[in-house]
Amino acid sequence: MEAGFTRVEVLEVSENKRTRNPEAYVLTLSAKKAPIDLRAPLRKTQKQIVIGRENVAESLRELWIFPVAPETCNLACTHCLYAASPRTRNPYRLSGDELSRLLAQVEAIDAKPHFLFTGGEPTLHPELYDFLDVIDDKGYSFQLMTNGTRIQKETATRLSKMPHLTKVQISLESADPKINDSIYGAGLYKRALGAVDSLRERGVAVTLAATPMDCNQEGLADLERLAVEKGADVKYISLYDLGSAKERGLKPSRGASDGNNQSDSTLMCDKGVAYSEGAFYPCPVLVKEPSTKLGDTLDEALSPESRQRVAKLRKVHSACQVCLKGST
């Protein structure tokens, strides 16, 4: 048993009950109620997992936040896993009180996660930049993931004044405007590059995010050269057989990895959880699947029971297999 954990009495022999030791949770599967000495060998009828406060905090290295519903967007990208579009009507908007409650839960477990604001299109939220100011003022590192169409010089300037912003990730599928706009919509290549230029001119780090597919694979090398020219990085995102991609029968690029090149420590679900529409999920990919919901509170989402559920999901869910085989 790890140092710092002493004898505790299990209040009730069932899964995920808090013990009298505030520094630990004990997951106990036992035939009957009994005091348990955590330093003593376990009987064959018992199985325990002890997670100290520092371990819980470590399990929350990333926290994905959807300021708007995943399907709320000003674009209708051909491969969107949420089938987001301007036609979608979901009134959910993250409130200031909701964000405050969320941060209180983070602080309660002494975690220092990296926040990732994503969507849908997060810049559609009228208070987004106020929320980013709150995160920045508290000293949390964070990033913004956007299609770039609503990043103007004024907003780029505001972002440049946030010292804990690590980068802005902008979706761009090809260095060829025709290919890019066939995926996102007419004129969007130019608008995305305008956002990149506005941010880079103000010293904001930028990553260009592309999803390798049959339709854009030949232009990816040119995209990498464009990124170098703009002083940006490139991130490749896996194509999931969900949402619009599934409806259209899109296929990943033939050059995309088909080998298991991911360790568990690099998976999104191993680094944290996603928060969307008032609930927590294993990752941003699964936030529209009610069966994967981990709970309404951070304690529930990070409990041993939830971690076991996530481990099982990895083995059976098709989206998890995509993450295991490719980049996330």
Stretches with model-predicted labels:
Residues 1-4, 193:
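Short alpha-helix
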Residues 6-7, 112, 141, 205, ...:
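Residue-level detector of anion-binding/catalytic polar loops
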Residues 12-41:
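Core SAM-dependent methyltransferase catalytic element
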Residues 14, 122-124, 147-151, 174, ...:
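Short beta->alpha connector loops
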Residues 17, 29, 89, 166-167, ...:
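Radical SAM enzyme [4Fe-4S]-AdoMet core and its adjacent flexible, acidic
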Residues 17, 39-53, 57-60, 84, ...:
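Flexible mid-to-C-terminal extensions adjoining Fe-S/redox cofactors in radical SAM and related proteins
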Residues 42-166:
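Conserved alpha-helical substructure of the radical SAM core
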Residues 73-76, 80, 266-269, 275, ...:
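Cysteine-cluster motifs in flexible loop/terminal segments that predominantly coordinate metals
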